Structures are given as structure tokens and as C-alpha cells.
Amino acid sequence: MDVVFTYGRFNPPHLGHKMMIEEVINKASKMNKIPVVIVSHSYGNKSNPLSVEDKTRILKRWFPQLTVLSSSKNLSLAKIAENFDEKSVMVVGENRKNAFSFLPFNRHALKRPNAAPSATKARAAAMNGNKEVFKNLTGYNLTNNIQNKISKASTITKKKRST
């Protein structure tokens, strides 16, 4: 499969992720490749409060036609990438450009604007119930469901640390 792809935790997906996925789609269109997003299976702690299903649902709302794959304990990013053509391209944030050197693909690094949204900021806004900040960072409403999942994961992480 000849693709332009990106990989991330997307926990939660935010406007910076959306911008990166738009770059994946645009680059894929120009290069006549398939745009793909691979969602990490990381889940169940303060940094990873949303499940693959939660993250995929949000990404598919933004980009209904997008191919979204996910890693798992038995299916690593490297294993998924074995199905990609050697001329495939990976799009990553500039801060992650060296993190994927184990993959044999050309990488296209995107500069991160100063004041760019971050999942850490979005999770903090959710924890504080700050719906306006959350929406400014993510582009979607902070639902009770998302807020509860983020709060619950943070509480579980705190309990693990204190024992």
C-alpha cells in the first residue's frame, strides 16, 4: 500500500493533530497516495485517557473518508508499516522527526507553531471543566463523557502513585 501516514496517541485529538492530518491528506493527494492515520493503542492512564474507539470516532468526524488504523499489543507500528510501500511517506511533528528512525520511510516534519494546541493542555482544560479552553484547543465540545474519562484516568494514575 502506497501511503502518506502519521502516527500518534491523539489523547485527545486537538487542532494541531487536525492540521497534521490535513497535511497528510494534501500530501497524499499531490503524490497520488493513500492518506492514513495510525492511532496508538496506549490507554488507561493520565496521559492516555481515551480509548482507540474514542479517538477514532473524533478523527472520523473530522475526516469521514480517512483510513484510520490502530496499533495494539500484538500489532506494533513497525508491523503495520510492513504493509506500506517503500516509497510511502511519514508526516510527523518536528519534535518527533527522529523518534521513528526505525521505520524505512522518508519523513516530512511539520514545524510546530509557538502557542500550538497540545493534548496536555486539552486534558488540563477538561480536568478543570474549562469548556471554552477545551473547545479552542480541540475544535469540539467538551462532553460529560470525555470529561469523565479524562478525570477518571487522572484519578486512577494518582491512586497508583500513592500506593
Go through each PLM region and give its residues.
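Nucleotidyltransferase catalytic core that binds NTPs
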Residues: M1-T163
